[in-house]
Amino acid sequence: MARLRTLSIGLLIAFSLVSCHWIRHATQDALRSDLKSAYLLVHGPGQAEQVQQAVRNCDCFQRPDEFIDWIEGQSGFRPGRYRIEAGMTPLEVVLLLRSGKQEPVMLRFQRQGNLEELAGLLGRKFEADSTEFLKAMTDTLALHALGVNMRQEQLPALFIPNSYELYWTAKPASFVERMVKEYRKFWNPDRTLQAQKLGLTE
């Protein structure tokens, strides 16, 4: 009987500790009190290890070590650029990271002198690095498959200066596909005809 009572008390204490731990993650603010928002950049494949590293890099959590320990072994996270708002709880952060609801990146660029400059900008803005972007932008076989037949020295003209919304996890190949669509949208038949009348080329 005494052993049963001791076991019951032990289980009650353990349950209370787990409940308190869960309540704390469901009610306390995740961000530091001096921040209104912060961005968490979770690299692929989006496992707990990548989330933990993102939290370390962010330096924006009130109790980063506690959060890192809490998500150890958890799964279902998705890579991306996530906006963490003041007032969000650790539990809400976890749910956001599992939802995949990224905050898009606003990309703005002027006409670039060469593709290396543009690739450098892209490497600073997105998950993929500049080398991957440059390779995709100069992949003549892939460009031909998209109907683009330009010489290497003509390729910078393919990337129309403007503002674009893209996800941080955008693949270099999908970025190039988007730019081809924007190029064709810009150089519509009317604009092409006007350029020809003025003696200009695309």
Region spans (language model):
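Conserved catalytic or metal-liganding residues and their short signature motifs at active sites
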Residues: 2-202
